[in-house]
Amino acid sequence: MTENAISDCLNVLDSTRTLCLRIHELKQHSRDADDQNPEQIKRQLMSKLLILREANRKSYEQLVQAKTITAEHKSELDNARIRLQALQYKKLHLKTIIKNYEEKEHIYTALPLVSKEEFLKEHPEFKSSNDHDLMLAILEDELKERQRLSTLKQELLKRKAALISENKAKRNALQKGDEKLQTFLRSSVPVQEYYNITSM
């Protein structure tokens, strides 16, 4: 209720009290000729009581409405508190993930990379780069070098396989030549024996 409504209610209460006292006095003492009619005072009292009842009903409705609004605000506050706790939990979880990530031994630290100084000698255009960009450039250069070496390795492996195949073919040819030579030598033994006998 507003302050004006409360003030009006208090005024009505005061006038109601006055009317009640007036009725009480009339019952206690005999009426004078100029006194008001008790029925008229009762009607005034009833009208004041109706005003008070209406004020009471309005104040009750306002109380119910205030309780509803308070419950809604409390619910919103509880939901906001729950959301805040969820955000704090997420924040803590993300901090833990970041901490674990920062403490983790990264694979690039175990790679035998070229030093920053050597890289900058070969690539002076990266001298003004920050550490992150410089590391990315070193890793990219390392990747290109490894891809080049991998391609070279594949070519050498193909060449090795071709040489092995060629050597195998030549070895087979030599073995066949040896076999033919052995066969020839074996077949020439009787001829040699014949010439040895005839030459004696």
UniProtKB/Swiss-Prot annotation:
Primary location recorded for the protein, binned into one broad class: cytoplasm
Disruption phenotype: Results in increased levels of H/ACA box and C/D box snoRNAs.
Annotated GO biological process: mRNA processing; poly(A)+ mRNA export from nucleus; RNA splicing
Keyword presence, Protease: no
Alphabetic keyword roster: Cytoplasm, mRNA processing, mRNA splicing, mRNA transport, Nucleus, Transport
The keyword Cytoplasm belongs to this UniProt entry's keyword annotation: yes
Compartments, as annotated in UniProt: Cytoplasm; Nucleus
Signal peptide (residue range): none
Gene Ontology CC entries for this record: cytosol; nucleus; THO complex part of transcription export complex
Role, per record: Component the THO subcomplex of the TREX complex, which operates in coupling transcription elongation to mRNA export. The THO complex is recruited to transcribed genes and moves along the gene with the elongating polymerase during transcription. THO is important for stabilizing nascent RNA in the RNA polymerase II elongation complex by preventing formation of DNA:RNA hybrids behind the elongating polymerase. The THO complex is also required to maintain TRAMP complex occupancy at sites of snoRNA transcription thus promoting exosome-mediated degradation of snoRNA precursors.
The protein's assembly and partners: Component of the THO and TREX complexes.
Record-stated family: Belongs to the THOC5 family.
Protein name per the record: THO complex subunit tho5
Organismal lineage: Eukaryota, Fungi, Dikarya, Ascomycota, Taphrinomycotina
